[in-house]
């Protein structure tokens, strides 16, 4: 597991109040991890803070799974 993947999974677990072991790549925030719309907004904000990026609303709407979040962070993070 890459450093970015581990950081993303930790943030998701903390934001959604689930065990890190439940946060696997294929999981959907809403369907599998019980997130609501406010949770997803807070999750995007936490990812922005962690990786020093700004996620436009149109991109945020596409980040619906753990893997989407990992891929976005890998592509856009500032080293």
Curated annotation (Swiss-Prot):
Query: An example of a Gene Ontology BP annotation on this entry?
Result: lipid A biosynthetic process
The alphabetized UniProt keywords are: Cytoplasm, Fatty acid biosynthesis, Fatty acid metabolism, Lipid biosynthesis, Lipid metabolism, Phosphopantetheine, Phosphoprotein
Q: Which segments of the protein form a coiled coil according to its record?
A: none
User: InterPro entries recorded for this chain?
Assistant: ACP, ACP-like_sf, PKS_PP-bd, PP-bd_ACP, Ppantetheine_attach_site
Q: Name its pathway.
A: Lipid metabolism; fatty acid biosynthesis
The domain of life is Bacteria
The record's Pfam families line, in alphabetical order, gives:
PP-binding
A GO CC term assigned to this protein in UniProt? cytosol
According to the UniProt record, list the residues that bear O-(pantetheine 4'-phosphoryl)serine. 37
Q: Kindly indicate whether the keyword DNA-binding belongs to this entry.
A: no
> Which positions fall inside the Carrier domain?
2-77
UniProt cross-references to Gene3D superfamilies, sorted A to Z: ACP-like
Q: Where in the cell is it found?
A: Cytoplasm
Q: Would I find Acetylation among this entry's keywords?
A: no
Q: Spell out the molecular function terms from Gene Ontology.
A: acyl binding; acyl carrier activity; phosphopantetheine binding
User: PTM details?
Assistant: 4'-phosphopantetheine is transferred from CoA to a specific serine of apo-ACP by AcpS. This modification is essential for activity because fatty acids are bound in thioester linkage to the sulfhydryl of the prosthetic group.
PANTHER family referenced in this protein's UniProt entry, alphabetically:
ACYL CARRIER PROTEIN, CARRIER DOMAIN-CONTAINING PROTEIN
Q: Which NCBIfam families match?
A: acyl_carrier, PRK00982.1-2, PRK00982.1-3, PRK00982.1-4, PRK00982.1-5
Q: What does this protein do?
A: Carrier of the growing fatty acid chain in fatty acid biosynthesis.
Give the family per the record: Belongs to the acyl carrier protein (ACP) family.
Q: What is this protein called?
A: Acyl carrier protein
């Amino acid at each position: 597991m890459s450093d970015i993947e581990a950081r993303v999974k930790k943030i998701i677990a903390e934001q959604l109040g689930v065990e890190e072991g439940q946060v696997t790549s294929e999981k959907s925030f809403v369907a599998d991890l019980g997130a609501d719309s406010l949770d997803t907004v807070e999750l995007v904000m936490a990812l922005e803070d962690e990786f020093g990026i700004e996620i436009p609303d149109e991109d945020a709407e596409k980040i619906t799974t753990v893997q989407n979040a990992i891929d976005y962070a890998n592509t856009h993070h500032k080293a």
